[in-house]
A protein has these predicted regions:
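Disulfide-rich, cysteine-dense extracellular ectodomains and adjacent flexible linkers of secreted
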Residues: 1-245
């Protein structure tokens, strides 16, 4: 009929928008999808037509019209819900963990620092952010979050390298020597038993582990692992003799 208005004269709201009410007269009546959401189709008539960005992604501008508008959370961060609306919605990997990939959608995507290392900061994004335990210490579990989680080598032991991952990495002081504190980082921390005393075991932790040479034996050198018998024709009455006199 001449002068009639056809429904085809009504224009779809464009992608990224929707209109709930009938009788919309302008494009501005079409409402933009909220931040964190998008819609690819045109002619949308309810807010639910807008789709939340997938977990691990966000969009901070309204009216997005394609999934590609959603931005990956950066490496070192994750987002475990849909519809992220800002980079700040992405959660940093916990201290002791890192993630080298972007778009992570779960805390489980964060990887624990290996044993022997730790990371104090949140949001670490590469394995190199994990720091070696210092010499003299070790940590035997993954995911450590502080230097304080690195354990001292026990008294009587030391380790000179960094990044030790087990108590067995700590090395015994040699026979004839001891060390009475933990956390030693060099064999030079091991102390010689004085002349006239010895210790035959490795890993001694006390000065009292050094035992005086028995009567008939002596030791003229410090750091002895054993005492020497007096030669034929000579004797030593006292224990702990350091000379042949």
């Amino acid at each position: 009929m001449i002068g009639s208005v056809s429904a085809v004269s009504c224009i779809d709201c464009e992608a990224g928008r929707y209109a709930i009410d009938t009788g919309s007269a302008t494009l501005e009546d079409c409402i933009e999808c909220a931040v964190g959401r998008y819609v690819v189709a045109t002619g949308n008539d309810e807010a639910e037509d807008c789709i939340g960005c997938a977990a691990g992604r966000y969009v901070s501008e309204p009216g997005s019209d394609e999934a590609e508008d959603c931005i990956d959370c950066v490496a070192g961060r994750y987002l475990d819900v849909e519809g992220g609306s800002a980079a700040s919605d992405c959660i940093g990997c916990a201290a002791g963990q890192y993630s080298e990939t972007s778009g992570n959608d779960a805390a489980d995507d964060c990887i624990g620092c290996v044993a022997g290392k730790y990371a104090e900061a949140e949001g670490s994004n590469e394995a190199s952010d994990c720091i070696d335990c210092v010499a003299g210490r070790y940590v035997d579990v993954a995911g450590s979050a502080a230097l304080s989680e690195c354990k001292d080598c026990a008294a009587g032991k030391y380790v000179a390298v960094v990044g030790s991952s087990a108590a067995s990495d700590c090395i015994d002081c040699a026979a004839g020597r001891y060390i009475d504190v933990g956390g030693s980082d060099s064999d030079t921390d091991c102390i010689d038993c004085v002349a006239g005393k010895f210790v035959e075991d490795t890993g001694s932790a006390l000065e009292s582990d050094c035992t005086g040479c028995a009567a008939g034996k002596y030791s003229t050198m410090s750091g002895s692992a054993a005492c020497i018998d007096c030669e034929a024709g000579r004797y030593a009455i006292d224990t702990g003799s350091a000379t042949l006199e």
